[in-house]
From Swiss-Prot:
Keyword Transmembrane helix recorded: no
Assigned protein family: Belongs to the phenylalanyl-tRNA synthetase beta subunit family. Type 2 subfamily.
Disorder cited: Rajab interstitial lung disease with brain calcifications 1: An autosomal recessive, lethal neurodevelopmental disorder characterized by multiple clinical manifestations including intrauterine growth restriction, failure to thrive, developmental delay, hypotonia, interstitial lung disease, and liver dysfunction. Brain imaging shows abnormal periventricular white matter, basal ganglia echogenicity, cerebral volume loss, incomplete closure of the Sylvian fissures, and normal myelination.
Needed cofactors: Mg(2+)
The protein's name: Phenylalanine--tRNA ligase beta subunit
Record's subcellular location: Cytoplasm
Catalysed conversion reaction: tRNA(Phe) + L-phenylalanine + ATP = L-phenylalanyl-tRNA(Phe) + AMP + diphosphate + H(+)
Gene encoding the protein: FARSB
Subunit structure: Heterotetramer; dimer of two heterodimers formed by FARSA and FARSB.
Length: 589
C-alpha cells in the first residue's frame, strides 16, 4: 500500500478542526485507511542517516497514512481532505467540469514516430491557479506518488507539468535519434544531447531507475513547442525552460505512455485534485490531442458514468439489513453520489472521474461496507460450515519438526531467496544445472534466485553463529523451488528436510543416526524389501570424495547425506568439518 505523508497541522487546518492522534487514527480506520506512523522530517533523517545529518531538519509533525493502492485520489493532501470531508458529510462532492478556452485551444500533435516507443499522449491546462509553498510541494509529491503506483515507475505513464506562459503552442510529441535531441534539462545550467544526459543520469540516485525504459531504443520521445523549445524527454526529465514554480499561474500538463487508459486516469487525477486552486474552482481547460491518423480528441475526459446496483444485493453481500435510502446515503458519503430509483430496490450510483477504482458492482458493495463500518456488522454463523484440517504435507512437517527438536537439533528458518553463488559456485555446481527460478530484476545480490536446496541457508546460519559452543546441530523443513515446464506457473515447490552437524570432527555417524531416526518415525523399515530404505555410495560436488551416499526409499531416490567438501566449508567462511543430510519429504505421504 502506498504511504502518504502530510503535515498534521496543515491537515487539521484543511479539515476545519483539530483531532487527537487517537481520534484521527479512528477516523482513518472508519474511512478504510490506516494511520501508519506519527513522525517528523527530523526523526526520519535521524533514523536513516544519524543525528548529525538530522541537525536543522524540520520538527513539524507528519502523519504517514497508508492508502489503498487503487485509491489514486487519496495520494495527496487535497484528495485526502476532500474525501474525509465528504465522508463526514461536511461538504458535498464537487462537480468537475471541462471548459473550452476563451481563445485558441492548446494542441498536442502526436507524430507517427512515437508508435515505436511511447505511442499515447493526453493533455490539459490548469488556468489561473494559485500556489503556496505547501500547495506546490503537494503538486510535485502527487506526481511522484502516481509515478510510483499507477504509472509503474514511469514505464506505463510519465507526467510532465510546464509553465504555459513560457511556451508557445501548438506542441509536438515526436521521437528522434538521441544525438538529434539537445536541450537544457531541469536543474542544469547548460544544454546536453540525449546521449550525454543518459550517461550523466546513470549516477543520479533518482533518475537512474528510469533510464532502462528508453535507453536501448533507437528513438527517444521528445515534446517541442512551436518555437522548437523542448518541454520534456519523457519518461526521463523535463526541460528547464518551462519549469513550474510557486509563482506559476497557468500549467500545461502532458501525460505520455504505453497505456492509454492509465494515461487518461492519471491526467484526470491531477487536474481534479488541483483545480481546487484555480480561479474558477474545479474547472479544467481542455486541450486537443491530434493523433497520427489525423483524428483528434479533447482531454481531460472527466467522464461521469452511472451504475445500477440492487439494494438487496448490497445487504446480502455485506451481511446487513439496511433500507435502500440508507444504503444510498452510505455510498454518497464514499464520494459516490447515489439515489434510489425505480421499484425502490434499485440504487443509481454516479461514478466521478476521481474514482477510477470503481470497476464492478463488488467495488460499490465494498464502499458501502466501509461506510457502514466493519465493526458494526454483526457476526453470524454461516448457514453451512466445515471444520478446517491441515494439509497432509503440513501435518507431516509439523510432526517432523517436533521430533527433530527432540533429537537435539535446533530449527532454523532461512530466506527462500538466495544468491546464485550460494546454490551453485559455493556448492561446486554450474548455475545452469540447478534448474533455479531466477528473479528478473533482483534488488540485491543476496536475493537473485529461489533456493533449490536448504543447505546454503543452514551453512550461512552456522557462519553467523560461529561463536556459539560446539557442536552446532541445525535443521530446517521448508520448500525449495525447481523449474517445471509441466506446471501452469513454470515451477514447482518441494518440501525438503535438511540437517547439518558442525563440530571438530565430521560426525557422519550423527547424521546417519538421524536419518535412521527419521525413517523410523516415517515407518519406513531398513532394506529394499517392503518399501524400505537403503543408502548407496555416491558422489556429489558438495561432498568429500568417498564420504557421500544417496538415500533410496520406496524404490526412489529421496536425497543425499555425507561429509561436506573442504572447499564448500571454506566458501561459506567456516573452519571445521560438517556433515549434512537433505531429503524430499513428499514421497513419504
Amino acid at each position: 500500500m502506498p504511504t502518504v505523508s502530510v503535515k498534521r497541522d496543515l491537515l487539521f487546518q484543511a479539515l476545519g478542526r483539530t483531532y487527537t492522534d487517537e481520534e484521527f487514527d479512528e477516523l482513518c480506520f472508519e474511512f478504510g485507511l490506516e494511520l501508519d506512523e506519527i513522525t517528523s522530517e527530523k526523526e526520519i533523517i535521524s533514523k536513516e542517516q544519524g543525528n548529525v545529518k538530522a541537525a536543522g531538519a524540520s520538527d513539524v509533525v507528519l502523519y504517514k497514512i497508508d492508502v489503498p493502492a487503487n485509491r489514486y485520489d487519496l495520494l495527496c493532501l487535497e484528495g485526502l481532505v476532500r474525501g474525509l470531508q465528504v465522508f463526514k458529510e461536511r461538504i458535498k462532492a464537487p462537480v468537475y467540469k471541462r471548459v473550452m478556452p476563451d481563445g485558441k485551444i492548446q494542441k498536442l500533435i502526436i507524430t507517427e514516430e512515437t508508435a515505436k516507443i511511447r505511442p499515447f499522449a493526453v493533455a490539459a491546462v490548469l488556468r489561473n491557479i494559485k500556489f503556496t509553498k505547501d500547495r506546490y510541494d503537494s503538486f510535485i509529491e502527487l506526481q511522484e506518488k502516481l509515478h510510483q503506483n499507477i504509472c509503474r515507475k514511469r514505464a506505463l505513464v510519465a507526467i510532465g507539468t510546464h509553465d504555459l506562459d513560457t511556451l508557445s503552442g501548438p506542441f509536438t510529441y515526436t521521437a528522434k535519434r538521441p544525438s538529434d535531441i539537445k536541450f537544457k534539462p531541469l536543474n542544469k545550467t547548460k544544454e546536453y544531447t540525449a546521449c550525454e544526459l543518459m550517461n550523466i543520469y546513470k549516477t543520479d540516485n533518482h533518475l537512474k531507475h528510469y533510464l532502462h525504459i528508453i535507453e536501448n531504443k533507437p528513438l527517444y520521445p521528445v515534446i517541442y513547442d512551436s518555437n522548437g523549445v523542448v518541454l520534456s524527454m519523457p519518461p526521463i526529465i523535463n526541460g528547464d525552460h518551462s519549469r513550474i514554480t510557486v509563482n506559476t499561474r497557468n500549467i500545461f500538463i502532458e501525460c505520455t505512455g504505453t497505456d492509454f487508459t492509465k494515461a487518461k486516469i492519471v491526467l484526470d487525477i491531477i487536474v481534479t485534485m488541483f483545480s481546487e486552486y484555480c480561479e474558477n474552482q474545479f474547472t479544467v481547460e481542455a486541450a486537443e490531442v491530434v493523433f497520427p491518423n489525423g483524428k483528434s480528441h479533447t482531454f481531460p475526459e472527466l467522464a461521469y458514468r452511472k451504475e445500477m446496483v440492487r439494494a438487496d444485493l448490497i445487504n446480502k453481500k455485506v451481511g446487513i439489513r439496511e433500507t435502500p435510502e440508507n444504503l444510498a446515503k452510505l455510498l454518497t458519503r464514499m464520494y459516490l453520489k447515489s439515489e434510489v430509483i425505480g421499484d425502490g430496490n434499485q440504487i443509481e450510483i454516479e461514478i466521478p472521474p476521481t474514482r477510477a477504482d470503481i470497476i464492478h458492482a463488488c467495488d460499490i458493495v465494498e464502499d458501502a461496507a466501509i461506510a457502514y463500518g466493519y465493526n458494526n456488522i454483526q457476526m453470524t454463523l454461516p448457514k453451512t460450515y466445515t471444520i478446517a484440517n491441515q494439509f497432509p504435507l503440513n501435518k507431516l512437517t509439523e510432526l517432523l519438526r517436533h521430533d527433530m527438536a527432540a533429537a537435539g537439533f535446533t530449527e532454523a528458518l532461512t530466506f527462500a531467496l538466495c544468491s546464485q553463488e550460494d546454490i551453485a559456485d559455493k556448492l561446486g555446481v554450474d548455475i545452469s544445472a540447478t534448474k533455479a527460478v531466477h528473479i528478473s530484476n533482483p534488488k540485491t545480490a543476496e536475493f537473485q534466485v529461489a533456493r533449490t536446496t536448504l543447505l546454503p541457508g543452514l551453512l550461512k546460519t552456522i557462519a553467523a553463529n560461529r561463536k556459539m559452543p560446539l557442536p552446532l546441530k541445525l535443521f530446517e523443513i521448508s520448500d525449495i523451488v525447481i523449474k517445471d515446464s509441466n506446471t501452469d506457473v513454470g515451477a514447482k515447490n518441494y518440501r525438503h528436510l535438511c540437517a547439518v552437524y558442525y563440530n571438530k570432527n565430521p560426525g557422519f555417524e550423527i547424521i546417519h543416526g538421524l536419518l535412521d531416526r527419521i525413517m523410523q518415525l516415517l515407518d519406513v523399515p531398513p532394506g529394499e524389501d517392503k518399501g524400505g530404505y537403503v543408502i548407496k555410495a555416491s558422489e556429489g560436488p558438495a561432498f568429500f570424495p568417498g564420504r557421500c551416499a544417496e538415500i533410496f526409499a520406496r524404490g526412489q531416490s529421496v536425497g543425499k547425506l555425507g561429509v561436506l567438501h573442504p572447499d564448500v566449508i571454506t566458501k561459506f567462511e567456516l573452519t571445521m568439518p560438517c556433515s549434512s543430510l537433505e531429503i524430499n519429504v513428499g514421497p513419504f505421504l
